[in-house]
Amino acid sequence: MSNTQTVKAVAKYIRMSPHKVRRVLNQIRGRSYQEALMILEFLPYDAGGPVWQVVHSAAANAKNNYGLDKKKLIIEEVFANEGPKLKRIRPRAQGRAYSILKPTCHITVIVKGTS
């Protein structure tokens, strides 16, 4: 029976809607580390950048903390949770003010590797 190790990396307070980030995360779920980086490199979405950084960080954690080989890593779990909303006010006509909610999210990547 092979020994598997899971490693986690989290990026918090990313100034992006979790809905838009999940669209990117669905593309890399269950793929190998190198395949995921290749996909993220060429996706036309802005969310690809922060997700690439978190995946890269998870692989670095696996290598430095547990001595795992990056080539053998598989993305086991990825998800984006909702963070706090930044509240802004936009002045409108006749003394009114509209509130603008700028969403943030927390991206979590869990990679699995065999030692």
Swiss-Prot record:
Pfam families: Ribosomal_L22. It comes from the Eukaryota. The keyword Zinc does not apply. GO terms for cellular component: chloroplast; large ribosomal subunit. It is found in: Plastid, Chloroplast. Its main location: plastid. InterPro entries: Ribosomal_uL22, Ribosomal_uL22_bac/chlpt-type, Ribosomal_uL22_bac/org-type, Ribosomal_uL22_CS, Ribosomal_uL22_sf. Gene3D superfamilies: Ribosomal protein L22/L17. This protein binds specifically to 23S rRNA. The globular domain of the protein is located near the polypeptide exit tunnel on the outside of the subunit, while an extended beta-hairpin is found that lines the wall of the exit tunnel in the center of the 70S ribosome. This is Large ribosomal subunit protein uL22c. It comes from Trieres chinensis (Marine centric diatom).
